[in-house]
Amino acid sequence: MARAKYQFLPDLSEDDIRLLDRVSDWIMAADEKYITKFSAFLDERQCLLCEKLMASVKYENYRLWGGYENAARRMLCVYPEYGEVESEDFPITAITLLYRKEDKITHRDILGSLMGLRITRDSVGDILVGEGKSAVFLRSSVAGEVTSALTKVGRAGVKLSEGYDGSIHIEQKTQEISGTVASMRADCILSLAARISREKSAQLIKNVGIEIDHMPKNSPKILLEEGCTFSVRGYGKFKLLSVDGTTKKDRIHITLNKFV
C-alpha cells in the first residue's frame, strides 16, 4: 500500500519509503499544526526523492541546506505556509580542523575518526579536505562532543575550531570524452563513456544497474538527457555535457565528462 502511494518514484527501497512517509507526515503537520521540522543529513539520492515528493504534492514550503552553497549532503526543512527559514536556522555546525601540511589526511580518515566517536552517518554532512586544513559539517547536537573529544585523525594531531571561512576549494577533476552514438539510450552512451561494447553495456545495466541522477535503473533502453549524471559500479561517474548534432549517417554526436 505504501509503495503504491509513491508509484511515480520507481525502484524504492524500504528505507526510501520510510523517509517519504516521514516527510509526508511533516507536510501534514506543517499544514495543520504549523510545525517546522528538520531532517538529519540526507545524501544526494534522498534529497532528490524529497524534491520529487514535494513536486508531486505541489508543496513549496521546504528548503534543503548543507551548511554552504552546493553542498552534496543536506538537511531538509519543512515549514508552514507564510513561514520563512534562513540558513542559520538549520541545526548545522561547521568545524574546521587544522593540522600540519605534511599530514595527508583524507575524507575517509576524518569520517572514520567521527565514526570512532560513535557519531552516526546521518549526523555528518559534507567533509571538505584541503592542505593543512579541513572542514566538516555536523548536526549541531553532536558538534560539542566532536570538538571536545577529537584530537587526532589517524596519526595526525588536529586542532578544532567552530566555523568555516570558505577557504577550502575542491576542484573536481574531469576527463572529456566525445564521440557518436546510434541513439540516446543508456546502453549506447555507457558504451562510449566506458569504452566497452554495446552488448556488454546492456548486460551491465541489466545485471549491475545504472544510476541516473542518483536514481537506480536496470533498463538499457532508458533515454538519457543533456545535463544528466550517470554511473555504473566499477566504471565510474559521468555527466552528459551536450548533444552536438547529428552526422550524415544520423548518428548523434555527444560530449561527456568523466569524473576522475
Residue spans of the language-model regions?
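Short strand-turn-strand beta-turns centered on an Asx-Gly dipeptide
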Residues: I212-H214, R233
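Short hydrophobic/aromatic patches on the structural cores and recognition surfaces of FHA
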Residues: S201, I210
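Short, well-ordered loop/turn sites that connect or cap secondary structure elements
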Residues: L204-I205, L224
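Structural motif
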Residues: G227-C228, G234
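Ferredoxin-like alpha/beta domains used as RNA- or RNAP-binding modules
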Residues: M1-A193, P216, L223, G236-V260
